[in-house]
């Protein structure tokens, strides 16, 4: 007798991070706006105000908010969407057996308990942030992200200080709602926010804003479950993921995705061709426009915020990949290339792209135009196939913009460091400054198990050059499906890369957290060092491995140098002695006997 598959209610991690509390900043233009941030407190002896930082963790880190996975999150944006009077509720399509991979009975993931009627744009209305921006309308979402980007900065010199090279970007000292509107209207930024994802806390992706990161997750035909995926979602955003892509394959795709979206405060992206392929039993040649169209509508009704569409893979480009070391490494790209070769025609994604735009326009699903021909090895970087597809993505961008659809462009991949900037420059030129979203890129191919590092190097560089969002890579890349620990490692690695890029491109205020932690380090405030870091738990555990006692939390040394060789302790002694004797006296003392190099007398011959 077969044992029934059990589907327990997922347990997710909640509660604030150390020394942190959730704060909310009210809007001024629109009622009801409360922008979440995390405030990190320092020790009272520091004499410093709490530090506000960007927070994508949603209500899960707010002890004053009760969350129940079975009910989902509160519909934050529902009133904003309704007030615009350009959408309508309708019955929606019926869920079919194919939507969940034909799984039945006790192996079927239960439906999410709450199922609201889906919304769509009325008649010819375009309920997209791009359409509103072009009409001169500043939406609540635009004000929300402006407040969020500023992180309680003001226009004072200390808050607007910047030191970097932005390579021609237009980064303002202070982000206003009007600046957000103008960037979206120009196509340089997007707010991925499906009208059927009201639980979303709006965020912005663009070159002139904070660099964002995405975390991938998803079930496969081999491993993982709905419970694990919901837990990984909450875990990823706890550590700073700005968006999450559900790349599920195998069975139970529809129901698992519903649980994820209803419990996600961040945008959710998908690759619809994966589910469409499951509906035709994994046979790429059997894919049709009708199956794909139905899948788009299914996912749009659920609330997916952005679609990766590999419409740039064209028939004449496929032969360009034959001599590559690693061929076509994109799953979506390889699926469409196989379809094109079998049918010897352009893909239905390319031929029906305007119809795809019409669907996305109805729900404000943003495009993430996929790089199906991205290089899978540094030997293949910047080749003819990659850049031919990029040019096509630029053409498709204009078509989507004409339909009032928001667009970002996906990029590589595997690229050696000296070739990275060319990728950014070509993307800006070919794709008309639409936001760039890259996987890494990985800068070397010799480190399986450490590709979060090989890619973090490239991610920091391309983020500095202008990339708007970085897709994380975990230690399991090329090796297996990431688990909870891998997700955290990938997210933290990419938060480091994104922040390093923000510093390098001169984002105002980016250095505030660095300076706060540096002061804590110099003053031996160990607890503050832990709490101000991206990963307080790991920082403290490393410290406590060798100095675990509470007394060590105030010690003026660590186990690396010990008490006699700590450079910062010696610096404190030098500073104290200088203050005691006076800087002028100290200077005189050094002049008398402290010179390391004695100047030579002038031995040049006198002029005759």
Swiss-Prot record:
Zn(2+) binds at residues 414, 478. Catalyzes the synthesis of the hydroxymethylpyrimidine phosphate (HMP-P) moiety of thiamine from aminoimidazole ribotide (AIR) in a radical S-adenosyl-L-methionine (SAM)-dependent reaction. [4Fe-4S] cluster binds at residues 558, 561, 566. It catalyses: 5-amino-1-(5-phospho-beta-D-ribosyl)imidazole + S-adenosyl-L-methionine = 4-amino-2-methyl-5-(phosphooxymethyl)pyrimidine + CO + 5'-deoxyadenosine + formate + L-methionine + 3 H(+). Homodimer. Gene3D superfamilies: 6.10.250.620, Radical SAM ThiC family, central domain (3.20.20.540). Binds 1 [4Fe-4S] cluster per subunit. The cluster is coordinated with 3 cysteines and an exchangeable S-adenosyl-L-methionine. Belongs to the ThiC family. Keywords: 4Fe-4S, Iron, Iron-sulfur, Lyase, Metal-binding, S-adenosyl-L-methionine, Thiamine biosynthesis, Zinc. Its EC number is 4.1.99.17. Substrate binds at residues 216, 245, 274, 310, 330-332, 371-374, 410, 437. This is Phosphomethylpyrimidine synthase. One of its GO terms (biological process) is thiamine diphosphate biosynthetic process. The gene is thiC. Pathway: Cofactor biosynthesis; thiamine diphosphate biosynthesis. The keyword Cytoplasm does not apply. One of its GO terms (molecular function) is 4 iron, 4 sulfur cluster binding. It is an enzyme of class 4 (lyase). Its cofactor is [4Fe-4S] cluster. It comes from the Bacteria. GO terms for cellular component: cytosol.
